[in-house]
Regions:
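Intrinsically disordered, low-complexity terminal regions
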Residues: 1-149
C-alpha cells in the first residue's frame, strides 16, 4: 500500500513539470495600464515608457505559452509561469510599455532593459538574487531608489 501511494505521489509530481520544445514563438496582447512590475525567474524584461496603448509581447517556447501568467492588480503587472513547474526554456523575453513606472520588484536571475528614458518623480527597484539593469539611453530623470526586497 505504501509503495502504491508513493508511486501515485511521484507520478502526480512528474505531471506538473514541463520543458520548452526549443521552438520560439511570439505573441502580442493589449493590456491595462500599470505603474509597477513584479517578476521572478530567468527573464529578459524589456520596458519602454510611452504614451501608446500598453501591450505585452511575449517570446518563449511555443509549448509554454499556455503556462505564461500575466496579471494586473492595483496597477501592478505580475509576470511569470503558472499551472506547471517549467524546468527548461530556450528564452523568456517580455517587451512592454506603460505611461510611467514607479516600482520594479524582481527576483531570480533577471534582466531589466529600459528601452527609453524613464521620466517620473521616483523609481524604486527591489531586487533579490542576480539582477541586471541596462539601457542604451539616459535611464532616469528624477530620483532612483535601489535596495533589497
Amino acid at each position: 500500500m505504501i509503495a502504491f501511494l508513493m508511486g501515485m505521489f511521484f507520478s502526480t509530481q512528474a505531471a506538473d513539470h514541463v520543458k520548452g520544445n526549443g521552438k520560439l514563438s511570439t505573441k502580442k496582447i493589449t493590456i491595462d495600464d500599470f505603474n509597477a512590475i513584479k517578476f521572478d525567474g530567468v527573464i529578459d524584461f524589456n520596458y519602454e515608457q510611452s504614451e501608446s496603448t500598453p501591450h505585452i509581447e511575449i517570446t518563449v517556447d511555443e509549448n509554454l505559452h499556455p503556462y505564461v501568467n500575466i496579471d494586473i492588480q492595483d496597477r501592478v503587472l505580475t509576470v511569470g509561469f503558472k499551472g506547471a513547474k517549467v524546468d527548461h526554456f530556450t528564452k523568456f523575453i517580455f517587451k512592454t510599455n506603460s505611461k510611467w513606472l514607479k516600482e520594479v520588484k524582481a527576483s531570480g536571475n533577471a534582466n531589466f532593459i529600459a528601452n527609453s528614458p524613464l521620466k517620473g518623480d521616483e523609481l524604486k527597484i527591489n531586487a533579490r538574487y542576480s539582477f541586471f539593469i541596462s539601457s542604451s539611453k539616459a535611464i532616469m530623470e528624477g530620483t532612483w531608489l535601489y535596495g533589497p526586497k
